[in-house]
Every structure is written in structure tokens, then in C-alpha cells.
Amino acid sequence: MNILLDTHIAIWAIANHPNLSVKARELISDPDNTIYFSAISVWEVLLKHDSPKNNLTLTPEQFAEYCEESGFYQLHLSTKHVLTASSLDISKVDKEHRDPFDRLLLSQAKAENYSFLTHDTRIPLYGEKCTIMV
């Protein structure tokens, strides 16, 4: 199975963080699965790293490097991914929670027919079958 990691899942995975569930660890470590991180996540890490509101010390360069060292493949953003975002049903998602990172990551997974691994309880509100909650 091809699996795209939500940004927080990728961060938890590369840091071996205790928030990463057993199910997530099993899916990520399964040799039959191919694991991807997105260029969008690199951008999200950059913004969070530079924001005084966050205490993320991980730089975007470190994030990308550690993901690659963990055996994850990078998924680049394409026009197809952006256009797929318009097919997401946002009607059940509160306006203040319509995170553009979430929408683009989910649309990437949908466009590529990948599963999307997340712990974000708002993601299932989009109703996409590709979502795996962990």
C-alpha cells in the first residue's frame, strides 16, 4: 500500500514520538507499504519553525533529511493535486478548520490513490475513503 503521511505523523515518526500509535508504527514499518512525505509538509514545517507561536525546533531541511533517512519518499506537488482539492467536500468542515495544508495533503493522497495517515480528527469530515485514522 502507498501511504502519504500527514505532517504531524511524519514528525512523530522521525522523532519516534510516543504520540505515534501502535497502528501507525505498524503501517509505517510494514515492508509491503511504501511511505511518502509531501513537499507540502516541508513548507508547513518551515512556517511552523519560523512562527513565534510554535516551539518547533525542527528545521525544514532537517525534516526532509530525516524523512529520507527513514526511508520515506518525497511526493512533490503537482497541478493535478491542486485541482483535486476542488473535489473535496468541505461542507461538513467548519470554516475556521479548513486548513489549506490538510486540504492539499488529502488531495495529493486522493489524486495518487494513496492512503492518507493522520491523527487529525477533522480529516474524516471530508469523507474521503483514503483516510486512515491512527
Describe the residue ranges of each PLM region:
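Short, well-structured N-terminal submotif of metal-dependent ribonuclease cores
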Residues: 1-37, 53-65, 121, 126
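Residue-level signal for well-ordered alpha-helical positions
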Residues: 16-17, 48, 88, 129-130
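General small-molecule cofactor/ligand-binding pocket signal
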Residues: 36, 75, 132-133
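Phosphate/NTP-binding elements of NTP-utilizing enzymes
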Residues: 45
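Active-site neighborhoods of divalent-metal-dependent phosphate/nucleic-acid chemistry enzymes
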Residues: 57, 69-119
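Charged phosphate-binding loop/patch that engages nucleotide di/tri-phosphates or the phosphate backbone
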Residues: 111, 115-117, 121-134
